[in-house]
């Protein structure tokens, strides 16, 4: 393990001892805010320190076994060689585990998300593919045990969506979907194509973490224009009676959000405001993400929405993720919701990149 990482672990060990003392301090115990904060930090640090103690113990065992290699007794030397080999294997495994524990954690990983899918080039076929992508992510959400609800939709003339916005709720949603943002290209023969020619269309996907109240940008009500209108979505006769749909325009940024899925104007407004907060947060963080990506030459995680990240080729049954040069011939399974076949290699590549930069 790199010396710089061992130094970080030594500093973390000192902090662990400090936290242990603080949590036993009567003054801290009486202050629930501080006590909760220290308890959370302690819970995060403790597994790392316990693993580090195991690492140091195995390191000492290795040094002891190596010293016995110089012994005059051949049997003892043979035994020492076995112990050295075993200790080196354990040390390597513990070192790998510790490095992963030290990887910087994305504070958004545990958050719910807003999923935006928009048809790009390709007209009707792009809208149809937007519908296919939404179905793919909906199936994936079901497989993960997540809840997905549509906030806004603009249907295409021949099926699919010109635009569809959904909120996805569950465990570690952003952690698994954060690399889906970008341009998704489809190559296939449209149903309306009589001569069997392959057409290329594209859609854009954006995945925005839903900020909590503490993380959300403070929005000045004076910066908002709120319009209400009659919902064009589901709801039977109700949609013709009340202006329950809500459209909110953030005047300084020009961002517009709308929600029409609930029968209650109040609920639609609350969901639209949450979506607006996510978009404003995303806009603020985009520049920082781009700076990090360009500095470290990252392709995975650059967050560039215009970047073509994936191609779905139906005639060949192929899906290709261009960021990591991954090609799979299981397009049917992926479109039915087995998106983990692409997501898992992306996460592994990103983690490998983080590990490479860890000791810098």
From Swiss-Prot:
Keywords: Cytoplasm, Methylation, Protein biosynthesis. It comes from Pseudomonas aeruginosa (strain ATCC 15692 / DSM 22644 / CIP 104116 / JCM 14847 / LMG 12228 / 1C / PRS 101 / PAO1). The modification N5-methylglutamine is found at residue 237. Signal peptide: none annotated. The keyword Transmembrane helix does not apply. Methylated by PrmC. Methylation increases the termination efficiency of RF1. The lineage of its organism: Bacteria, Pseudomonadati, Pseudomonadota, Gammaproteobacteria, Pseudomonadales. This is Peptide chain release factor 1. HAMAP family: Rel_fac_1 (MF_00093). SMART domains: PCRF. Disulfide bonds: none annotated. Peptide chain release factor 1 directs the termination of translation in response to the peptide chain termination codons UAG and UAA. It is found in: Cytoplasm. It comes from the Bacteria. GO terms for cellular component: cytoplasm. The gene is prfA.
